[in-house]
Amino acid sequence: MLRSKTFLKKTRAGGVVKIVREHYLRDDIGCGAPACSACGGAHAGPALELQPRDQASSLCPWPHYLLPDTNVLLHQIDVLEHPAIRNVIVLQTVMQEVRNRSAPIYKRIRDVTNNQEKHFYTFTNEHHKETYIEQEQGENANDRNDRAIRVAAKWYNEHLKRVAADSQLQVILITNDRKNKEKAVQEGIPAFTCEEYVKSLTANPELIDRLAYLSDEMNEIESGKIIFSEHLPLSKLQQGIKSGSYLQGTFRASRENYLEATVWIHGDKEEEKEILIQGIKHLNRAVHEDIVAVELLPRSQWVAPSSVVLDDEGQNEDDVEKDEERELLLKTAVSEKMLRPTGRVVGIIKRNWRPYCGMLSKSDIKESRRHLFTPADKRIPRIRIETRQASALEGRRIIVAIDGWPRNSRYPNGHFVKNLGDVGEKETETEVLLLEHDVPHQPFSQAVLSFLPRMPWSITEEDMKNREDLRHLCVCSVDPPGCTDIDDALHCRELSNGNLEVGVHIADVSHFIRPGNALDQESARRGTTVYLCEKRIDMVPELLSSNLCSLRSNVDRLAFSCIWEMNHNAEILKTRFTKSVINSKASLTYAEAQMRIDSAAMNDDITTSLRGLNQLAKILKKGRIEKGALTLSSPEIRFHMDSETHDPIDLQTKELRETNSMVEEFMLLANISVAKKIHEEFSEHALLRKHPAPPPSNYDILVKAAKSKNLQIKTDTAKSLADSLDRAESPDFPYLNTLLRILATRCMMQAVYFCSGMDNDFHHYGLASPIYTHFTSPIRRYADIIVHRLLAVAIGADCTYPELTDKHKLSDICKNLNFRHKMAQYAQRASVAFHTQLFFKSKGIVSEEAYILFVRKNAIVVLIPKYGLEGTVFFEEKDKPKPRLAYDDEIPSLRIEGTVFHVFDKVKVKITLDSSNLQHQKIRMALVEPQIPGINIPPNVADKALTAPGGKKRKLEK
């Protein structure tokens, strides 16, 4: 059956075109009920249960299926995801609305419908001839969709009665729309609100905690006192932004001060890049990462950023008065040049709320169901939730979602989502850091796994088309110990003309991950593999990452090869790229490869190849450094785990060998060669990576630190910086050069992916290369998969597709990759920090030598080389006499009583674990040497204050 819709549309050129849309209706779409003989199993995929069970509702004691409307899916997804909610019919009408309004919720509901244990069934009511309806004259789209949902619910009930007359099976409409519910009841459709239905499930009282209360009736504060200004409607905000009255930007809350935030303005005007927001009323219920509209205050009301550290310790609505008292502390007299553009939030353009991890702060009122939740992320305000399981949730990590923030409430309202486990447990804390850094880590869905090759897999004749057979070459891989996702392998051999052939062979992941399918979409969403201390979150399923794509030894593998002909001076004479098949002759660790190179007794083909590669790598590195490439340093920690408990039993810095540098040089060379090739072929659509030069002010701390040791660091170019660092040696202080390079690393900007057609600056500052990309790690970086596809098209080994040559879509991919890469780094650091805490928890009190990296007004920041660990030694203690402190920003130095501390001075510190705040345990450091009366803590004396409950956070003045 065919319906068509005809309408006229005005074109951009001013013309008029006639549009005809065809809409096909069918009579063979299954209802999803196994008992239905009429549909004859026409439904495919996950279906409803024959006899719905485990839904003992006091309102509906008979067997039933649920049919939620759009708003229930959008706002009560936490309820629907609970294991007790099964046998749900999701209409096509509802899915389309959810998809248009919230991509994250749409993804979650798709995951639920793909879970066969949940028995969710998607019914395509818009193409069923019995349930499709036309929009009536004068009816808006929302009312039409509500009617379509009621029509489908009514059809289901009548249909099930016809096919199973003796069955009591019914379909219940779940809607929070009062008018929709009234109309449904009038039409004879069983209908309840989500709250009514959930409260009727007496066997699952915990479900009530998951309810999102959208109207603020349930969470109104009894006093009713208005605290915040009303948010302006979106139409007024858009008018104001267009006229210039308001500015649009991203709200960034402060970690250090809950009464302060900044708004990063969306636009090109540099002078309006950042607006300061100060004070609880000016923040006006904005939450970190929300897109907001701000009004710039008159210049007379501009303020300076506060140096005061303030944590929100309030418990009730009266705390607003305390907040206002605290705001007065922020307003201190400062010079005119310290003032910053200041504004106030007038409206919310887009909420970017997510589920938050944290802990419950149980109410002091006995039997109270309302409690405050304290998020782990200090940038998020406390959230008021209603729960009946407060006692069971004490001391545990939980997830809470925000529902809304009424004007008369000091805190937003939310609901309990999930109990993650006990604070301090490894599994719990790992889950928290993954969730808090937005690292996708759910198991791969069946839809994704369906695109994997079937096992057993082998290379076919079809696979060999457009490929070179390089299995005869002596190829080997060199990686860290325990590496299973081997991306790259190398070879070097002498040619008959006396030159050398060098090959970098990279796993051909793009052969297995084809554009646009579910596997490709999931890989693009994840963006990168995340390496934690004890866990790896793969970007692609394990079958690919550790098996079919991994270039393991003695198995045939598909590769993408970059092959150079070089002379013995490492000068490139020819470069070619080819899809290939290789058979690695050895999977070596860096230590094993180094041993082969150094051993005079070993002269086999693999060792000869490694020696050739190593010699060329040294020449390549020398050439890069002469051009101005930077050799920086950062302390990397490696844990040794107990084989049974998996707790860290040793902590040491990572050891680097010549072979680390050897592999790095050829990966850099391959990336540069590929970048040139794809940019030649796709000048507007190449995915590249750039590293911006830091602004001169970034180097101030490095220049001052070097000056304190009578050394001069020049920073006008990367070459002058590299040369200065090379000359900065001290025979009496061999670690000085490493410290300078660590400081130089802190001065750098973040490298980012970008589309060549959207930017003119390609330069990579750190590598001193005019162009660069990522080609060598496609198992763990999605950027490399895109680069592989571009290169394959460039050499005629594969065909293109529309998205590959769409610079706007490529730019969006780059934004996601940059975000995922940054979040992965933060998650890795959080994992190291947690395992460091575990290590020192078991070690007790430890004293070690350290070097000062920074001096502050009331503290020194030190680095402990043995552990690669950084920490802060404070010199002001609460409830203790304050020492005489004199800070000099120019040198920089800090005088305490009679002792002066400079950057890079050697000290001895005591390291302990501060467990006074369960949610934010941290490593504390105290000075042991040099001796300062009233400051030092003898190395053999435990600092009980550090582990006593109720310890207050000390303020670090910058």
Swiss-Prot record:
Residue list for modification Phosphoserine: S215
UniProt domain CSD1: residue ranges: 227-319
Domain CSD2: 372-438
Residues where N6-acetyllysine is found: K18
Name the record gives this protein: Exosome complex exonuclease RRP44
Function: Putative catalytic component of the RNA exosome complex which has 3'->5' exoribonuclease activity and participates in a multitude of cellular RNA processing and degradation events. In the nucleus, the RNA exosome complex is involved in proper maturation of stable RNA species such as rRNA, snRNA and snoRNA, in the elimination of RNA processing by-products and non-coding 'pervasive' transcripts, such as antisense RNA species and promoter-upstream transcripts (PROMPTs), and of mRNAs with processing defects, thereby limiting or excluding their export to the cytoplasm.
Single Gene Ontology BP annotation: RNA processing
Organism ancestry: Eukaryota, Metazoa, Chordata, Craniata, Vertebrata
Intracellular or extracellular location(s): Cytoplasm; Nucleus, Nucleolus; Nucleus, Nucleoplasm; Nucleus
InterPro entries (UniProt xref): Dis3_CSD2, NA-bd_OB-fold, PIN-like_dom_sf, PIN_dom, RNase_II/R, RNase_II/R_CS, RNR_Ribonuclease, Rrp44_CSD1
Oligomeric form and interacting partners: Component of the RNA exosome complex; within the complex interacts with EXOSC4, EXOSC7 and EXOSC9 of the exosome core complex (Exo-9). The catalytically inactive RNA exosome core complex (Exo-9) associates with the catalytic subunit EXOSC10/RRP6. Exo-9 may associate with DIS3 to form the nucleolar exosome complex, or DIS3L to form the cytoplasmic exosome complex. Exo-9 is formed by a hexameric base ring consisting of the heterodimers EXOSC4-EXOSC9, EXOSC5-EXOSC8 and EXOSC6-EXOSC7, and a cap ring consisting of EXOSC1, EXOSC2 and EXOSC3; DIS3 associates with the base ring of Exo-9.
EC assignment: 3.1.13.-, 3.1.26.-
